[in-house]
Amino acid sequence: MKVIRVKNQEEGGQVAFSLLKESLAHGAKTLGLATGSTPLTFYKEIVKSDLSFSDVTSINLDEYVGLPVEHDQSYDYFMRENLFNHKPFKENYLPNGLAKDLSVEVSRYDNLIAEHPIDFQILGIGRNGHIGFNEPGTPFDIRTHVVDLEESTIEANSRFFASKEDVPKQAVSMGIASIMESKMIVLMAFGKEKAYAVKEMITGPITESLPASVLQNHDNVIVIVDEEAASELD
């Protein structure tokens, strides 16, 4: 696991984008994408670049269950607003959180990932060490699945909704086994509240109680952290 320390989130986005450019130059065709505030500067770098993504497919990590794609807190909406409306891709895939049969949707998404092996996966990390919506206790061998969100995750996401009661309680998430099959993983973390999770991910035991710790078993992970997120590292 290689750690790159940056001054701030803007520099972090620039570093992540330079890694992506290198990956694309070596033939990467499928990007695994994340939502939330962490990758926003990375997406801004993609949007303002003159690189063409017309041959590139994207596969997102997760989507809430029950939110229409028009809802401004759906991850589909987030991706369109921050990336897809500004930079055309060959294909963009997200889980369908409105599927009538979520078990069928889980199988569909696993098949999609199998058809489009991920070359470059961008990740954030939750305060509790979750990646995607793979919460503590998630088996490392799981693939796409329906998740009951942890109270801490619901709490963290409540700032984006009118009230905590409006936050979805479930999501469809790519599984840890699928994430680990990505050829390259770039995890970004910014802010003091991520410092403990970053430290445990890098130096702690590999344990399902901190899902991101499994990344120690991957041979091509780059962690981009600002000074605050790196503050508990030696």
From Swiss-Prot:
Identify the SUPFAM superfamilies for this entry: NagB/RpiA/CoA transferase-like
What keywords is this UniProt entry annotated with?
Answer: Carbohydrate metabolism, Hydrolase
EC main class here is hydrolase
Q: Which residues form the active site?
A: 62 (proton acceptor), 128 (for ring-opening step), 130 (proton acceptor), 135 (for ring-opening step)
Q: What is the protein's name according to its record?
A: Glucosamine-6-phosphate deaminase
Asked if Hydrolase is a keyword of the record, the answer is: yes
UniProt cross-references to NCBIfam families, sorted A to Z: nagB
Q: Check the record and name the PROSITE patterns matching this protein.
A: GLC_GALNAC_ISOMERASE
Point out the gene that encodes the protein.
nagB
Q: Which residues form a coiled coil?
A: none
Q: Which Gene Ontology cellular-component terms appear in the entry?
A: cytoplasm
**Family of the protein in this entry:** Belongs to the glucosamine/galactosamine-6-phosphate isomerase family. NagB subfamily.
Q: Which reaction does it catalyse?
A: alpha-D-glucosamine 6-phosphate + H2O = beta-D-fructose 6-phosphate + NH4(+)
Alphabetical GO biological process terms: carbohydrate metabolic process; glucosamine catabolic process; N-acetylglucosamine catabolic process; N-acetylneuraminate catabolic process
> Its biological function?
Catalyzes the reversible isomerization-deamination of glucosamine 6-phosphate (GlcN6P) to form fructose 6-phosphate (Fru6P) and ammonium ion.
Taxonomic superkingdom: Bacteria
State the Gene Ontology terms under molecular function. Answer: glucosamine-6-phosphate deaminase activity; identical protein binding
Q: Which InterPro entries match?
A: Glc/Gal-6P_isomerase, Glucosamine6P_isomerase, Glucosamine6P_isomerase_CS, NagB/RpiA_transferase-like
> EC number(s) for this protein?
3.5.99.6
Q: In which pathway does it act?
A: Amino-sugar metabolism; N-acetylneuraminate degradation; D-fructose 6-phosphate from N-acetylneuraminate: step 5/5
Q: Which organism is it from?
A: Streptococcus uberis (strain ATCC BAA-854 / 0140J)
What S-S linkages are listed for this chain? Answer: none
